[in-house]
Amino acid sequence: MLVLVINSMKASHLILGTQRETPSDAEVISHQLMIRAGLIRQVSSRIYNWLPIGKKVLQKVENIIRNEMNNAGAQEILMPMVQPASLWEESGRIDQYGQELLVFLDRHDNKFCLGPTHEEIITDLCKNLLTSYKQLPVTLYQIQTKFRDEIRPRFGVMRSREFLMKDAYSFDLDQESLDSSYQIMKNAYIKIFDSIGLDYRIVKADSGAIGGSDSEEFHVLAESGEDLLAFSDKSSYAINAELLTELQDEQDPFSLEGKSSPDVKGILKLKRGIEVGHIFKLGKKYSEVLNLRIQGEDTDIYPEMGCYGIGASRIVAAAIEQNHDEKGIIWPDALTPFQVALVEVNPKNKDEIKNKSLEVYNLLKENSIDVLWDDRDKRPGVKFTDMEVIGIPITVIIGDRTLEKNEIEIKRRVDEQPELVAHQDLIASIGLR
């Protein structure tokens, strides 16, 4: 069960960090709006601090992921970001990753690396944890910071050097059991992205440096996406367009548009996507090379492994790419940092307005509505601009004009005109209970 945490507060107590100017180096809208809305601040080249509003959204992503992982029977652990380089040498991936793997020496000249992924560590861990086939199948996961020394970090947190990721690893007795674990994780991913409210596609993909056999990617559709996707307009068929070489004219993936889908169900459409999840059937690649042996019924076996990753911080950026307008972010309901903004405007009688605002603030909290009370001594235009760029879906406005009539003004983020409601009808009109 996903627990809703209500964290209402006053804007005067919150480090908002909003900005009016768009950073000159921000190429895509998600990067621009994450800076302007005060979600992140850059520390170094594509390494970011997450400010209170951003951390609140990121935590909502984590909670949705954690909830579905737990529902799928996966068990949460936490592995170190710093890994012995010897494990990467043993698996052979230290050369494969090259300079993207940040390697360093400790004071005793022992070689370590900052983990971009954790296949080696989890396999080494399970040498001691898993001893018998009776413990299988099992899936372990973590939500952990990763580091990849990208040659061209760009697009804000969409392709940053440090990022937050959920990675899970399944261990199975045989291929049939792996197929089952893989499907369970795939179904969990579908629930995660459906819960968040993203328009996405599941596409056949290349396993890349992770290795293994079958793999699929989850892509959020957005013009800023770096991958070109080809998918049927009549079925669930979808693939990274670069992999569909046999249908391309002169090795041009854009030539796929309008051709018959390989599953003979519909016509191929092309759109760009942002990869936010990737699932793999690793087979015995890591269990064999790192010598993870488990006692079987008759003899020792190398377990079949699966690997399942979700970019938690990238989801935040992808959601913004898909949900914004000229004023700022329009969050999916599941990710909005606050459900309601409470704004005081033009008070002639400050005490009366303050008391009314406090009354409404407490009423919203009593009804389990997450509210940000903008009690700052700022002009109304500044307050409304901040609430719009942050993307709070509903603004409740308390002012002298409405106070005289015992009414409250409600402005929805996606509507042009506000509505006036009686005080006693506020909660029903908001419709969030």
Please provide the spans of the model-predicted regions:
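NTP/phosphate- and nucleic-acid-binding module
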Residues: 2-433
